């Protein structure tokens, strides 16, 4: 047996804390543990920091769809590709609040608002800040994703009372340039630093199933875990099939057990993060989702649509959580 695997297996058996400064080799040794040992370590980390029978429920709305100048090779909203998606203007605040109220009535406790921009213009940011303030007035947590931010942008959002800012790193540093060329990984990391400096919590994760290697998935986790403060929320997305984008030619759905292993590894590496089982759940069986929750995933998006792709029906989610004895709400 490899020495690194022996060390990780020993830690799984005695409950010792895994170090905070990670490299891909350590993450791979953890990921490759015998399944029961990995799940045990993930459960220990999960139970130490969260109620293991509870998931956070969030809702996601595209407040400005399509026409994005970035060339992210996985995205239906990029203006670089003919995906058949019609670009829209920024929604009115009243319409956003009405949607948030419906999401709250359906059980969501966090409302996430996404705009397909490279970076927000000042007048648009003012409108988003009004939305944040109004949604918070409903008693919901707020999250927005608006592209890259300057320190001034982040400070303005903090002043509006924003709880979370989502800005995914998407994949490993090594695979990044194969899917995006118009925005560097450092641009993303700089935005995360501006958000953190403004006192806003970070939501940051990535996408799997784009043709990347297992080492790329783990490299993404290492990047996140080694940030000065790792994200409070880590969404793991399965790529949703979108016709007309470059990733369509390289995509390969991950093996279900590989997904569970990745979630368990994320849970151990970032034990205090909310790990969100995000896009792609409509392709998963109930049994797979149950394993994902057992691995430490403790957040989902509820609602029939995620931006431009489908999501499990609300009734299906409610039935699954009830059968598992899992409550939902704020994490």
UniProtKB/Swiss-Prot annotation:
Entries under Pfam families matching the protein: BATS, Radical_SAM
Broad EC category: transferase
Record-listed [4Fe-4S] cluster binding positions: 68, 72, 75
Pathway this chain belongs to: Cofactor biosynthesis; biotin biosynthesis; biotin from 7,8-diaminononanoate: step 2/2
PROSITE patterns listed in its UniProt record: RADICAL_SAM
Membrane spanning stretches: none
Domain Radical SAM core: 53-272
SUPFAM superfamilies linked to this entry: Radical SAM enzymes (SSF102114)
Reactions listed under catalytic activity: (4R,5S)-dethiobiotin + (sulfur carrier)-SH + 2 reduced [2Fe-2S]-[ferredoxin] + 2 S-adenosyl-L-methionine = (sulfur carrier)-H + biotin + 2 5'-deoxyadenosine + 2 L-methionine + 2 oxidized [2Fe-2S]-[ferredoxin]
Known EC number: 2.8.1.6
Listed GO biological process terms: biotin biosynthetic process
UniProt keyword annotations, A-Z: 2Fe-2S, 4Fe-4S, Biotin biosynthesis, Iron, Iron-sulfur, Metal-binding, S-adenosyl-L-methionine, Transferase
InterPro entries found in the cross-reference section: Aldolase_TIM (IPR013785), BATS_dom (IPR010722), Biotin_synth/BioAB (IPR002684), Biotin_synthase (IPR024177), Elp3/MiaA/NifB-like_rSAM (IPR006638), rSAM (IPR007197)
Molecular function terms, GO-annotated: 2 iron, 2 sulfur cluster binding; 4 iron, 4 sulfur cluster binding; biotin synthase activity; iron ion binding
Cofactor descriptive note: Binds 1 [4Fe-4S] cluster. The cluster is coordinated with 3 cysteines and an exchangeable S-adenosyl-L-methionine.
Cofactor(s) the protein needs: [4Fe-4S] cluster; [2Fe-2S] cluster
Binding, [2Fe-2S] cluster: 112, 143, 203, 276
Quaternary state and interactors: Homodimer.
Similarity section: Belongs to the radical SAM superfamily. Biotin synthase family.
Function: Catalyzes the conversion of dethiobiotin (DTB) to biotin by the insertion of a sulfur atom into dethiobiotin via a radical-based mechanism.
Protein name per Swiss-Prot or TrEMBL: Biotin synthase
Source species of the chain: Bradyrhizobium diazoefficiens (strain JCM 10833 / BCRC 13528 / IAM 13628 / NBRC 14792 / USDA 110)
